[in-house]
């Protein structure tokens, strides 16, 4: 099965990794400015607006990207599956290219030999090429994506090759900590209906998968074959 993965940040508004958006009211100049601790600035023109518009600023850190890369490589080794990683570095020559470079540097320095010994491969391609390949694939690999890409593509993969209810969601930290959850989240809409006394019907398969995945991992950690099988 194909397993898209996600990193932090990018266009998502989280407590630590926040994107910033501005509704432009009218004509004016938009700039991207970085101010170093010593006061020096790096300034780039985004756009000279002649009318109203919209601006979005996104960011990530090398530390976060490195942690994501380690988590992906370790998960691939743990599951003995090939790892694909895809961005659009031909267009995003700094932002996406930084992801590509960090993944490759970490792979070459720390994981190439381990992957070879495990009989699996690391493969990088452009996101549009990856989508075309995935739709024709039989599965059996991990597809690592940036945050937004993974959010969208995971639903596409689950719908094209089964259903959303059959999708699993596993949070993996670089230190090897695993957390299993139902991919659909808390189904808030159904819960509010339940509070009103209305009848609800929720597919429980994703919750079952979360429990069985966690039990299997616990079995691996405790070396209990009957549980980890």
Where would I find each of the regions flagged by the language model?
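Non-catalytic terminal and connector segments of soluble metabolic enzymes
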Residues: 5, 23-41
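Glycine-rich oxoanion-binding loops at beta->alpha junctions
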Residues: 125-134
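A glycine- and small-aliphatic-rich helix-loop capping segment at beta-alpha/alpha-beta transitions
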Residues: 22-30, 99-106, 160-170
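Glycine-rich phosphate/nucleotide-binding loop
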Residues: 134-228
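Short acidic, glycine/serine/threonine-rich loops at helix termini
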Residues: 17-23, 94-99, 134-137, 154-158
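Glycine-rich phosphate/diphosphate-binding loop of Rossmann-like nucleotide-binding domains
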Residues: 34-38, 45-125
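Single conserved hydrophobic/aromatic residue that forms the stacking wall/gate
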Residues: 1-8, 12
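Buried hydrophobic positions in well-ordered alpha/beta secondary-structure cores of metabolic enzymes
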Residues: 9-10, 72, 144
């Amino acid at each position: 099965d194909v397993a898209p993965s996600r990193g932090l940040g990018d266009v998502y508004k989280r407590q630590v990794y926040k994107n910033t958006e501005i509704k432009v009211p009218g004509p004016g100049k938009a700039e991207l400015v970085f101010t170093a601790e010593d006061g020096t600035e790096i300034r780039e023109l985004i756009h000279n607006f002649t009318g109203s518009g919209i601006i979005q600023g996104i960011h990530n850190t090398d530390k976060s990207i490195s942690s994501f890369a380690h988590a992906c490589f370790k998960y691939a080794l743990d599951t003995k599956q090939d790892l694909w990683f895809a961005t659009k570095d031909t267009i995003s020559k700094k932002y996406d290219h930084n992801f590509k470079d960090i993944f490759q540097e970490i792979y070459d320095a720390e994981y190439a030999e381990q992957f070879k010994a495990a009989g699996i491969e690391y493969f990088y391609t452009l996101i549009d090429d990856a989508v075309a390949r995935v739709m024709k694939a039989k599965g059996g690999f991990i597809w690592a994506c940036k945050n937004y890409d993974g959010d969208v593509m995971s639903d596409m993969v689950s719908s094209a090759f089964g259903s959303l209810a059959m999708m699993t969601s596993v949070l993996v930290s670089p230190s090897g900590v695993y957390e299993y959850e139902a991919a659909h989240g808390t189904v808030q809409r159904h819960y509010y209906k339940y509070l009103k006394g209305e009848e609800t019907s929720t597919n429980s398969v994703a919750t079952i998968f979360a429990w069985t995945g966690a039990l299997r991992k616990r079995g691996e950690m405790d070396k209990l074959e009957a549980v980890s099988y």
